């Protein structure tokens, strides 16, 4: 849970600056010039890693600008981009990623806290379908209002993004989407100037840690357990309920399902301080000690593979990637009972 003392709300003046630059961007209609995969990489002053901007709306009806911070953020971008080809539920990916996103949308979709800011600044939009609002996404938390640091980051980012879009409009830069080209804007400290150029879009994969159980005595104990004719499915899902706090959290549910005889083996919410790796590994150790080595584990979530690849190989348990559609049914049933 976020420490209340660490969160600072943005001032009215900061919000005004953010809306001022966003309204300038709005007039340029950046979605007419950049596709959502044509990332704009901006290396801001005094920041070690760049930010990556994805402009949405050229190929869909939803207009917006998503900003991903650093290499980890770039991994989140590609994780979401690959959602249509993968097996992880779209809602899970939204709850799993971190970004600062601006939407152009219906007045009815504007969060209450954002509406208060808009009213206080007395901002008027063209139609009820053209309201501009901002959402902070953070892994494990509910979408929330931007804080002071996030507003400041977007102001600086959008000021530079404006220069990029204007250069594309004027024909000074011409990234080709078919060639997977984006744009880089960076500050040159040697000559104290900003430079912009077309470059191939950077690529990155979302990194998931993998672990090796170091307790050799425990590993041998697990390996020597009898093997039983059982196939187990493991999965994670974020529940659509809210855990109150300075920033409300998304409860993360761990599930183990008996895919041989049918039925849930265990289902529990991760506690404060727990994580996907420790919970998955903890289940494996406890289950094998009590019941024996399952024959197969099926999963679609990369956290599970990071936790179990090494120990499953050591214990001769097949760890298999599978869409595990049955878990979507289980999740739907769980959610319906909330």
Give the positions of each predicted feature.
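Secondary-structure boundary/capping micro-motif
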Residues: 1-254, 259-338
């Amino acid at each position: 849970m976020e420490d209340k003392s660490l969160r600072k709300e943005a001032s009215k003046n900061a919000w005004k600056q953010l809306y001022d630059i966003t309204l300038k961007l709005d007039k340029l209609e950046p979605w007419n010039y950049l596709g959502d995969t044509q990332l704009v990489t901006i290396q801001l002053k005094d920041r070690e890693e760049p930010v990556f901007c994805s402009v949405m709306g050229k190929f869909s009806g939803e207009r917006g600008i998503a900003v991903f911070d650093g290499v980890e953020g770039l991994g989140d971008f590609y994780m979401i981009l690959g959602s249509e080809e993968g097996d992880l539920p779209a809602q899970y990916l939204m709850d799993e990623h971190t970004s600062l996103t601006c939407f152009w949308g219906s007045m009815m979709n504007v969060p209450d806290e954002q509406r208060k800011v808009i009213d206080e600044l007395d901002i008027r939009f063209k139609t009820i379908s053209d309201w501009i609002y901002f959402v902070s996404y953070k892994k494990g938390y509910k979408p929330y209002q931007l804080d002071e640091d996030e507003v400041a980051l977007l102001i600086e980012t959008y000021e530079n993004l404006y220069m990029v879009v204007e250069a594309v409009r004027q024909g000074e830069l011409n990234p080709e989407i078919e060639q997977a080209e984006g744009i880089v804007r960076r500050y040159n400290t040697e000559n104290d100037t900003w430079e912009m150029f077309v470059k191939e879009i950077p690529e990155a994969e979302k990194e998931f840690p993998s672990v090796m159980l170091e307790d050799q005595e425990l590993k041998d104990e697990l390996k020597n357990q009898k093997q039983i004719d059982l196939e187990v499915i493991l999965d994670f899902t974020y529940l659509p309920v809210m855990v109150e706090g300075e920033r409300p959290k998304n409860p993360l549910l761990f599930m183990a399902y008996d895919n041989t005889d049918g039925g849930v083996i265990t289902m529990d919410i991760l506690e404060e301080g727990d994580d996907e790796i420790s919970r998955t590994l903890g289940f494996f150790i406890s289950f094998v000690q009590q019941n024996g080595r399952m024959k197969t584990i099926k999963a679609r979530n990369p956290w599970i593979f990071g936790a179990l690849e090494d120990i499953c190989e050591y214990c001769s348990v097949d760890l298999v990637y599978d869409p595990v559609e049955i878990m979507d049914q289980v999740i739907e049933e769980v959610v319906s009972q909330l």
